[in-house]
């Protein structure tokens, strides 16, 4: 399946289609959007965002704890869309606070 991903960035929102077997960060880059990242392995917080609508599968990541995920935080480098989804990007500072 392919879902609509909307990223709300500091420069404004961007939308693109993302297959459910492609990481959101990877697809965003394919579409020409630059997002923050570092490890690309779900082991840090550089790419953190916050899901405001929809669901993702980020089971490949290991940095976020259950509480953070329950609060909506997502690591875009290891997140597959599970529905149409809206994610606020550039949330590392809010996450690590």
Swiss-Prot record:
Which Gene Ontology BP annotations are present?
Answer: electron transport chain; ferredoxin metabolic process
Residues noted as binding [2Fe-2S] cluster in the record, renumbered to the chain: 39, 44, 47, 77
The cofactor note from the UniProt entry for this protein is: Binds 1 [2Fe-2S] cluster.
Instruction: Give the source's domain of life in one word.
Output: Eukaryota
Location in the cell reads:
Plastid, Chloroplast
User: What's a single GO MF annotation on this record?
Assistant: 2 iron, 2 sulfur cluster binding
Task: Provide this UniProt record's keywords sorted from A to Z.
Answer: 2Fe-2S, Chloroplast, Electron transport, Iron, Iron-sulfur, Metal-binding, Plastid, Transport
- 2Fe-2S ferredoxin-type domain segment(s): 3-93
PROSITE patterns in the record: 2FE2S_FER_1, 2FE2S_FER_2
Q: Name one GO cellular component term.
A: chloroplast stroma
Which co-factors does it depend on? [2Fe-2S] cluster
Q: Does the keyword Iron-sulfur apply?
A: yes
Protein function: Ferredoxins are iron-sulfur proteins that transfer electrons in a wide variety of metabolic reactions.
Give the UniProt family note: Belongs to the 2Fe2S plant-type ferredoxin family.
- What PANTHER family does its record include? FERREDOXIN, FERREDOXIN-2, CHLOROPLASTIC
- Protein name from the UniProt record: Ferredoxin
Q: Which organism is it from?
A: Scopolia japonica (Japanese belladonna)
Give the taxonomic lineage as stored in the record: Eukaryota, Viridiplantae, Streptophyta, Embryophyta, Tracheophyta
